[in-house]
C-alpha cells in the first residue's frame, strides 16, 4: 500500500495486554476488540487523518476458548466495517503468558497537513475533545462493581474515536 501522490501516509501501532489494558471480569470480548480499534483509530484521528488499513496480530494462551477470540475479532471487524478499513493480514501465535492483541493502522492525510506533537510550540492552545478521566472513572466503577456510572462504563468499554473531529481540527490549522 502506498498513499496517493497528494497524500502523506500515517502509521500507528497499539497493543493491549490482558490483565493490563483489559480484563474479562469487566469487559465482554467484543468490547475488547472495539476498544483496541478505537485506540488505533484515535491515533489517526489525532493526526487529522483518514484510516485506511490495518494489520492485526494476537498472542493467545493455549487454554483460551476460541469463541472468545472470535468475539474479539467481531469487535475489531465491526469497527473496520464502520470506518471502511481493510484488514491486510497479521499473525497468530501461542503464548504461555496473557493474551496480547496488536493492531498497526495505516491512514492518510493531505500532503503536509498532518498534525504532529512534534509541531507543537510554546504558546499553542492545547485542548481535549472529551471528558478527562471519563474512561478511567468507568474502569474504576467496573473494577469495584459500583452501581450507576453507566455512561463512564460505556466510555471505558466502547469508546468512540473522533475521526471526523480530527479532520475538522486539522483543517482549522
Model feature map: region roles:
Residues 1-173:
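Helix-biased detector of long, well-ordered alpha-helical tracts
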Amino acid at each position: 500500500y502506498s498513499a496517493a501522490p497528494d497524500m502523506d501516509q500515517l502509521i500507528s501501532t497499539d497493543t493491549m495486554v490482558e490483565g493490563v489494558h483489559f480484563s474479562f471480569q469487566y469487559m465482554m470480548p467484543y468490547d475488547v476488540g472495539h476498544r483496541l480499534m478505537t485506540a488505533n483509530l484515535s491515533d489517526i484521528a489525532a493526526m487529522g487523518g483518514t484510516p485506511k488499513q490495518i494489520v492485526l496480530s494476537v498472542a493467545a494462551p493455549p487454554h483460551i476458548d476460541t469463541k472468545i477470540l472470535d468475539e474479539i475479532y467481531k469487535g475489531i471487524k465491526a469497527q473496520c466495517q464502520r470506518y471502511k478499513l481493510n484488514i491486510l493480514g497479521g499473525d497468530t501465535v501461542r503464548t504461555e503468558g496473557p493474551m496480547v492483541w496488536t493492531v498497526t493502522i495505516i491512514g492518510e492525510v493531505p500532503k503536509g497537513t498532518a498534525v504532529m506533537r512534534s509541531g507543537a510550540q510554546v504558546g499553542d492552545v492545547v485542548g481535549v475533545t472529551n471528558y478527562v478521566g471519563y474512561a478511567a472513572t468507568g474502569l474504576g466503577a467496573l473494577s469495584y462493581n459500583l452501581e450507576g456510572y453507566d455512561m463512564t462504563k460505556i466510555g471505558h468499554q466502547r469508546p468512540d474515536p473522533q475521526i471526523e473531529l480530527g479532520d475538522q481540527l486539522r483543517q482549522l490549522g
